[in-house]
Amino acid sequence: MVHFVGAGPGAPDLITQRGAALLQAVDCIIYAGSLVNPALLGLARADCAIYNSAEMTLEQVAAVMKENEAAHKDTVRLHTGDPCLYGAIREQMDLLDAWGIAYDDTPGVSSFCGAAAALNAEYTLPGVSQTVIITRMEGRTPVPEGEHLAALAAHGATMVIFLSIGLIDKVQAALLQGAYTTATPAAVVYKATWPEEKLLRCTVGTLAAQTQAAGITKTALIVVGDFLAARYDRSCLYDPAFTTEYRRGTQP
C-alpha cells in the first residue's frame, strides 16, 4: 500500500497525527527533499528505507513503490504542505491504478495556511473578500489559457501566489494589470512556520523592490489583497441581531 501524506508547511509538529503515525509504521518513505523538513524523518523506524525524490524522476519514484508492493511493504510518499496543491500526485496515482496498487491520502496543512498564521491574518474578511485565489505565475511550466496572473488579478480578491518568488518583477507587473493598485497591501512569507521564517509586509507597488532587497529568491509565498489592511465588516454570525440554528438573535 502507498500512503500519500502531507508533511505540513515546515514545523515538524504541524504534521497530522495520522501522518506521523504512518511515518512511524511504514517500511519505506519517499520524501520531497527540496521542501520537506528532514526532522520528520526522525519518526521513521531504524530499518525504514528512505529516498529523496528531489534526486529522482517520476519513473524512479514509481519503481520504488512497485518494488515495495511486490515485497508486501508499505510506502509513504511524503509531500510538502498538502499534496493536493502543486503536489504532482495525480500522475503517480495513475501509475498505481494501472498496476493495481492500492493507495490513500492523508491531508496536510498547506503553506498558504501557514503563511496566514505567520501573518496573523484572515483571508476571507467580511466586506473585503470572500474569495481566495490560489495560483502561480507562468514560467518554465505554462498555465492554461485564461489562468494568466493578470487575468486572475482582475477579480481583486485575496490572492495567494505559489512558486513565483523568482519571477517577482513579472508578478508585480501582472498584478498591476488587474484590479490591484500600487497601494494594495501585499506580503511575502519565506519558509512559513520554519525556524528561519521571514515576513515582509509591503504594497503591490513596492513588492518587487522590497523582495529583492531582502534577498528572498525561493521557498516563499506571495499574498495580496485588502485583507491585510485594517478595514473590514463585523461578521453576521456572531452579531447579536443575527439568528442562527443555535441562537436566536434580536432580529428573525
Predicted regions and their residues:
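Short secondary-structure boundary/capping segments
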Residues: 20, 42, 67, 124-125, ...
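Non-catalytic, surface-exposed connector residues within folded enzymatic/regulatory domains
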Residues: 16-17, 34, 126-128, 183, ...
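Class I S-adenosyl-L-methionine
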Residues: 1-109, 114, 208
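Class I SAM-dependent methyltransferase SAM-binding "motif I" and its flanking Rossmann-like core
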Residues: 84-155, 198-201
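Residue-level signal for well-ordered alpha-helical positions
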Residues: 42-43, 118, 174
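A contiguous loop/helix-start segment that scaffolds small-molecule binding in enzyme catalytic cores
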Residues: 2, 60, 71-75, 131, ...
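Short beta-strand/turn micro-motifs composed of small residues
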Residues: 31-33, 79, 136, 163, ...
